[in-house]
Amino acid sequence: MRMFISMAISFYTSRIVLQALGVSDYGIYNLVGGIVVLANMLTSSLSGATSRYITYSLGEKDFEKTRRTFSTALMIHVGLAGLFIFVAETVGLWFVNTQLVISPDRMLAANWVYQSAIISTALGITQVPYNSLITSHERFGVFAVIEILSSCLKLIIAFIILYSMLDHLILYSILYMVISVCIIVFYRIYCLRNFSESRFIRILDRDLLPKLLKFSGWTLLGNVSLTVLQQGVNIIVNLFFGTIINAAVGIATQVQGMLYSFIGNITTAFTPQIIKGYVESDYKRMNYLITIGGKFSSICILLISIPIIIKMDFLMGLWLKEIPTGAIVICQILLIKNFFNSFNPLIYTAITATGNIKNANIFCGLEYLLSVGITYLIVFWTHSYIYAFIFNLITSLIACGIYLWALKHEISSFSVYDYVVHTILAVTLLGCVSFGTAFFTERLIQSDIWSFFAISFISTTLIIILSFYFVLDSNSRSFIVLKVNSYLHYGHK
């Protein structure tokens, strides 16, 4: 329920923001301020790396070691934030002011957006150890509260800029930054009050430091490369098509992110258990968690995405007063990409648990960087942004293959064949059958609203039934039956 409330607020906020900024300014914000979204992805990945070592020390019940681990990680991330600021204020600032296709009269506003994004991102990087501590203690409820609070605050600033007499783009970027800072402050206060190991000490764990630096370095390589790919596609679109298509990308990316967040809770819940499985050398349980987590994540994406993909034009029309050119088709492609991306997080979590992340990050990093050049050539030859996003979808499939290879290299008991056949192909076939049935149903009903409800009901029913009998294993089926019976029994009391 919390996710639906947060998503509903976020969708309505996007409508108000687009109305207040206009398509062109919204495109500028997505292009220049997009660094915030990508940096959030980067800090989430760094958080996973830091969580590994904190979870290890918590498992050993060594308070002093946990405190040294936290303080060492915090110092590393402060250094990374400083490095980020240096690069952003030199190379990044030059690129924004000389290379991007932005109207001269909006360049001042673009710089305000850029500087606000730098502040939010730098503080977000230093926040990583605190979020890792919350995750390692499995206090997921605090994330839920903050997510809803953040959504409400963003809705408030959307209305503020709608009726403000000031420059809407500048005001929006500043207020968005203020919200980010407030959330960071809240998390830190929460950690200081609940986890005594979060109190910083000026002691570097010299045994842990090289391990953390090495681990964070490889993580940084892979995720900086992914960030370069995501923002690179946005920049390429800007160079060829201008800020109007950037607005479409911004809308599509926001929908993609909001729907993908549904599996975030699944990934977060499985992560500590997978790491603990590796620590205890319980590889059978670890492999089971990777498999069942991948199934639940991908099935969840199908349940949400199929009706939206089929009725995207209708839903966009209800949502936005003005639909940016290209937003519908880009959004449909990105939602399909979400499905294939849903397999990757837990596979990478397992690789992270082993500590040997070098191969996965080197090869994925090379793939992502190479993909930027290929994307440029595709757009240059075809003069179509659609093919760029289709190719971007393919990179997710390649990355999944690299992660599976890397995991098999570290854990020989993990069966790539079983995972591909019984998880990826099984759920993909389930998705194709459900999508085909829903698409055929949509053709039979003329009314948009009734066809949306019909395909939602049919696809959901079909996915649940087929998943239960043909995708999930007997243990998972028994667990679900037990939970349903328990819920029904409780409901009749």
Residue map of PLM features:
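Interhelical loop/hinge segments that connect adjacent transmembrane helices in multipass membrane
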Residues: 169-173, 187-230, 273, 281-288, ...
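Helix-loop junctions and terminal segments of transmembrane helices
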Residues: 44-60, 136, 195-196, 252, ...
